Amino acid sequence: MVAVLTWALALLSAFATAQTQKGFWDYFSQSSGDKSKVARVQQQKLTWETTSLKDSLEQDLSNMDKFLEKLGPLSGQGREPPGLAHDPEGMRQQLQDELAEVRARLEPYMAEAHQQVGWNLEGLRRQLKPYTVELMEQVARRVQELQEQLRVVGEGTKAQLLGGVDEARGLLQELQTRVVQHTGRVRELFHPYAQRLVTGIGRHVQELHRSVAPHAAASSARLSRCVQTLSRKLTLKAEALHARIQQNLDQLREELSAFAGAGAGGAEEGANPDPQMLSQEVRQRLQAFRHDTFLQIADFTRAIDQETEEVQLQLAPPPPGHSAFAPEFLQADSSEARSKLQARLEDLWEDINDSLHDGGLSHLEEP
């Protein structure tokens, strides 16, 4: 059954490649197992309206779905389907042979399109990398500044902490004020970097749209949707990253303020705060903020990689022989695989319809 599903996916990819390969209809005519039917379909395409062509293709897809149902669940289990040939092994071998021929003919075209789209998406990742690198550098720089501005170890501060209750309480209250002041300042400083990241995503994704259009197997409408979806997803993730950095700063402010407040309360009760302990606590909280924020930026970078890889599969699927060829179909359960296959078939129709409107019907008129 996996062979049948793979055969269907190979034909699906073949139609997607047809938008950029003018000779596809000739190939389909030569390699189809039912040449007389293809000849009739080609003759009808010369006179049918596009809506009639869609009805015909949808009927063919419906027939294929019924054929898949007759063969049983994708797991390969189930009773022998009625009404089919008495030689299922022969049928399976025939499908495998046809699939091998499809692979051999389509591999170069699909591999080239997949590679070209991949290069353009890799270019997008390279263009966005400076934004995340700059953000990490800013985090490190601001942490260093906060560490200097919130220092409580020095000859003057040490004497203050050990000089008496009023002196110690005054120093710790001043520390609370500095925590609020400087974390608020850092909070504001991150806004321009977040805005530059969002703006950069929008600009570079639009550049990607223009550069990938000549190589994508998808229709222009589907290409636009994919690019817009990518831009929206990355923008939302960038905004979420900025919100998490702000939350990290708020948490840092609250923790340091609470710690300084607790120290001031202890000083009122006669306990002399340890300057070294205070300094170490501030440093540990700042390093925790730096570590957590770096992890969140790294997660955002991985999300860029994942989203662009998904777009590459949508716009230019790898050839059938590629290890990444439809793994979600082969690993999914029956209902999920059928749902994903149906979505692929709907994308297929849109690509074919777009190609025909752009002059694809003229291919059928060639002798």
Curated annotation (Swiss-Prot):
The GO terms describing molecular function are: cholesterol transfer activity; phosphatidylcholine-sterol O-acyltransferase activator activity; phospholipid binding
Modified how: Phosphorylated by FAM20C in the extracellular medium.
Please provide the Gene Ontology terms (biological process) for this protein.
acylglycerol homeostasis; cholesterol efflux; cholesterol metabolic process; lipoprotein metabolic process; phospholipid efflux
Keywords (alphabetical) are: Chylomicron, Coiled coil, Endosome, Golgi apparatus, HDL, Lipid transport, Phosphoprotein, Secreted, Signal, Transport, VLDL
Main subcellular localisation: secreted
Q: Which residues carry this modification: Phosphoserine?
A: S56
Q: What GO CC terms are in its UniProt record? A: chylomicron; early endosome; extracellular vesicle; Golgi apparatus; high-density lipoprotein particle; late endosome; very-low-density lipoprotein particle
Q: Where in the cell is it found?
A: Secreted; Early endosome; Late endosome; Golgi apparatus, trans-Golgi network
Q: Which InterPro entries match?
A: ApoA_E, Apolipoprotein_A1/A4/E
Q: How does it assemble?
A: Interacts with GPIHBP1. Interacts with SORL1; this interaction leads to APOA5 internalization and sorting either to lysosomes and degradation, or to the trans-Golgi network.
| Function of the molecule | Minor apolipoprotein mainly associated with HDL and to a lesser extent with VLDL. May also be associated with chylomicrons. Important determinant of plasma triglyceride (TG) levels by both being a potent stimulator of apo-CII lipoprotein lipase (LPL) TG hydrolysis and an inhibitor of the hepatic VLDL-TG production rate (without affecting the VLDL-apoB production rate). Activates poorly lecithin:cholesterol acyltransferase (LCAT) and does not enhance efflux of cholesterol from macrophages. Binds heparin.
Family, similarity comment = Belongs to the apolipoprotein A1/A4/E family.
Protein name as it appears in the record: Apolipoprotein A-V
Provide the taxonomic classification: Eukaryota, Metazoa, Chordata, Craniata, Vertebrata
Gene name, please?
APOA5
